[in-house]
Amino acid sequence: MVSAPGDHAGVSREGLRILPVTGLPEFRPGDDVAERIAAAAPWLADGDILVVTSKIIAKAEGRVVPAPVDPEERDAVRRALVEQEAVRVLARKGRTLITENKLGIVQAASGVDGSNVEKDELVLLPADPDASAAALRAGLAERLGVRVAVVVTDTMGRAWRNGQTDAAIGAAGLRVLHDYAGAVDGQGNELHVTQVAVADELAAAADLVKGKLRGVPVAVVRGLPTQEDGSTAADLVRAGEEDLFWLGTAEAVERGRREAVLLRRSVRTFADTPVEPDTIRAAVSVALTAPAPHHTRPVRFVWVRDAQRRQRLLAAMADKWRADLRADGLDPERIERRVGRGRILFDAPEVLIPCCVPDGAHSYPDERRQAAETTMFTVAVGAAVQGLLVALATEGVGSCWIGSTIFAPEVTRAELDLPADWNPLGAIAVGYPTEELAPRPPRDPGDGLVER
């Protein structure tokens, strides 16, 4: 990227330097971190950026937990702490958990760590790393009379990439994000969504001199101008469902399975967006996996794609309905009000008619068993209809099953040129909803579930 006005990469004339702070002791609960750093780095100057490993903050703040020395017992305690510090589990692989912790940070094991601590201890993250950064900054100003920025870091993995890097989990005294929106590069291109996580870049750069084995938990970045804007590391966290990848693959699949049926609802108002034919074909393919008696295929979905034929069918059904309602003694106003409820089938982008066909049905000499056979085939069609509605919902397509053709089977068969033994079982309006589908909570079964 060509430097633009306000580029985050500006450095002083002396260049950018990263300096280790050596000679620090092992930190224990109750230690004064500011006092120890001030003693080890009296050369700190205004404008320096102090980058501090979170572990020394956590130790000093008493976030150390006793643990057994036995490896298996120690791991059991560690896993219990991981669950304790987590608010949700995003992914798991073997014993490894990727969690969102109470700080909103997504990382392995909720930040619970057993490295660089005694073998009979485990350490948690600081309870409030931003507050810790602010307190350390104030403590150094009091002891050395300098204004420095502070970044508190922890090591994290990254999606899509091997290896780990340090990232900021606490910050004070600097702008943690640099927003390039509205800036123009050297070729005249306006930048729109580029935000640079400056605090994370500082954390990663400082780790080049801190390392993991040399006992150097603090480094100083010198020569990078900073601007204090009140932001903290909490501003780096993209929370929950705002993130495009807020669940692991297996967890996303599991959630999708749980919510698939709950996405279905009766949609009666549709957007103008056309539904791709392949989307409907795919949903029908799913629907045809529904259970059926005697290994038969008792359902056919008639897709009324010809607009004129649909108009003729719906008009003929409306006339039949009016005649039935007149025979019931309803006045014209009530009749038109009832018929008007069927406008959804005129307005829907697509309409499908589910039909029960008797292919493979058994014949019985008595009325009781023959009625049971008919019921069995009808139930199978209902299962396929539900499968279709759910399959459409999982693709973001709305639908509404309406019983209309059940009351006008002869008219439906005549207008659609269907065989005499095809029994239409309603109509399904299909189209994209005007509002995105969302799963609704399951109902309390109440008297819907009877246990014996």
Swiss-Prot record:
Residues 1-248 are annotated as: Coenzyme F420:L-glutamate ligase. It comes from the Bacteria. FMN binds at R264, R265, S266, V267, R268, A292, G403, R440. Transmembrane segments: none annotated. Pathway: Cofactor biosynthesis; coenzyme F420 biosynthesis. Binds 2 divalent metal cations per subunit. The ions could be magnesium and/or manganese. Monovalent cation. The ion could be potassium. Bifunctional enzyme that catalyzes the GTP-dependent successive addition of two or more gamma-linked L-glutamates to the L-lactyl phosphodiester of 7,8-didemethyl-8-hydroxy-5-deazariboflavin (F420-0) to form polyglutamated F420 derivatives, and the FMNH2-dependent reduction of dehydro-F420-0 to form F420-0. This is Bifunctional F420 biosynthesis protein FbiB. It comes from Nocardia farcinica (strain IFM 10152).
